[in-house]
Design a protein with these regions (language model features):
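Cap/insert and terminal regions of metallo-dependent hydrolase folds
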Residues: 175-230
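Binuclear metal-dependent hydrolase catalytic cores
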Residues: 1-170
Length: 230
């Protein structure tokens, strides 16, 4: 049985935002302490998949049992809050390279951010990474389970969501292309980005996300990538 752990549900700045004295950032409620958005999936078939690897990755992993290690990493897109922690994958790259899956744009960005991991003669101790290119609506087997990349729009940037069995995971969404709707529908669990109530050019509002969730008719829906406005 698939197990989902939300490692972080915050937006790009994290919550609390540094230097902010708003009610959410000064709150003592633990639900208002949100690391950058990421998730860990234990597939039930012996595999463990990490979705996104942001700047809080090290802190997120230290909260988990030491035996937990990702067999593969799925990247939704190239923004720093989703890839900025890739250097901290280095403990998991031995003896075998960490398998990272992303669309072509994101894969190119990872190579440019972490060039020392992709040279022929690597310096000892750098992250041992192997990149694979994903294409929307072309399923592939990753860490022993079937993964379907979903096309998603993040403002003008095409990014990826994922369907893994009964789970649909979509962050940083401003629109779901019509061709993705049938594949994103009817999930047991829908994880969906919802930035805030006020409109934003590259993220859905809470109201827009709830309307999309009704269309997709998942059994349970969880909202992520929430900023300090709520």
């Amino acid at each position: 049985m698939l197990k989902l752990t939300i490692l972080g549900s915050g937006t790009s700045c994290g919550i609390p935002v540094i230097g902010c004295d708003c009610p959410v950032c000064t709150s003592t409620d633990p639900r208002d302490k949100r690391l950058r958005t990421s998730a860990l999936i234990e597939t039930g078939e012996g595999g463990t998949i990490l979705i996104d690897c942001g700047p809080d990755f090290r802190q997120q992993m230290l909260r988990l049992p030491r035996a937990v290690r990702p067999d593969a990493v799925l990247l939704t897109h190239k923004h720093h809050d989703h890839v900025g922690g890739i250097d901290d994958l280095r403990p998991f790259g031995w003896p075998d390279a960490v398998q990272i899956y992303a669309d072509e744009d994101c894969a190119d960005d990872v190579r440019s951010r972490f060039p020392y991991s992709f040279v022929e003669n690597k310096y000892p101790g750098v992250p041992n990474l192997e990149l694979h290119t994903l294409h929307p609506l072309q399923s592939c087997r990753i860490a022993g389970t079937e993964v379907l990349p979903l096309p998603v729009m993040h403002g003008k940037l095409p990014i990826l969501g994922f369907r893994i069995g009964g789970l649909v995971y979509i962050t940083d969404i401003s629109a779901l292309p019509p061709e993705a709707v049938p594949y994103a529908s009817g999930a047991s669990i829908l994880v969906l980005g919802a930035l805030r109530h006020k409109p934003h050019h590259s993220h859905e509002t809470v109201e827009e996300a709830c309307a999309l969730a009704q269309r997709l008719q998942a059994r349970d829906t969880y909202l992520i990538h929430m900023c300090h406005d709520m």
